[in-house]
Amino acid sequence: YELIAEINHPNIVRIYDLGVGDDHAHIAMEYLDGGDLKQRIAEGITERNAVSYLKQIASALAEIHGVGILHRDLKPGNIMLRKDESIALIDFGLAKRLRLRMEMTDEGEIFGTPYYMSPEQGHGNGVDHRSDIYSLGVIFYEMLTGEKPFRAGSAMAIIYQHARAPIPLLPTRVSQYQALLNMMLAKQPEDRLQSATEVPEWL
C-alpha cells in the first residue's frame, strides 16, 4: 500500500495515512459514498456510463501499471463510486500476494470464484499487467449486458471457460464494442491490448 499511497490519481482511492503497530496495521483512506460497481451493475448501467467507467478504470490501471503494480483482484466489488460518478479503484491487498488461493467450505461454496480471472491467472501461471486488462474486459462485458461472460457451477469449470470457451457476442444494441472486447478477452496475453492506455483508442 505504500506505493499506492504515493499515487495521486482521480480514479485511485486516496490513502491519507499508513501505520503499523506491534500487533496491527491501520490505513486511513478516502470515504467513498457512491456504493460499488457490483451494486451499480445489479441496478443496471447505461451504455454511456459503462463506457465512462471503463475509461476511468483503464486510466487507473495505466497509472498503477506504470509504477509496476498489478491489481490481480479486479472485480466490481473492488471498484467504488463517488457521488459525482467518478470511479475509485480500491483493495490492492492481492498486489503483494504471489499466489492466488481459492477457499472452499465443506458445503462446496467457493470464495473468490474466478469470474474475473484471466486464463493464465486461473491456471496459476505467471501474470503481468495484461491479466488486469483481461479482468477489465470481463467487467466491461458485465456492465454492458448485466451478465458475466462465463458462468458455471464450479471454480474449475469457470477457469476452463476462460481458457477455452469462445468470447461471447454482445447484444446488437452494443455490438460496436465487440472488437474492443475481443482485444481485452483474448485467451493469450500477447493477443490482448498490451496496455490499458490503448482502451480509449478503441472507443
Please state what every model-predicted region is.
Residues N8-N11, I110:
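Flexible N-lobe loop architecture of eukaryotic-like protein kinase catalytic domains
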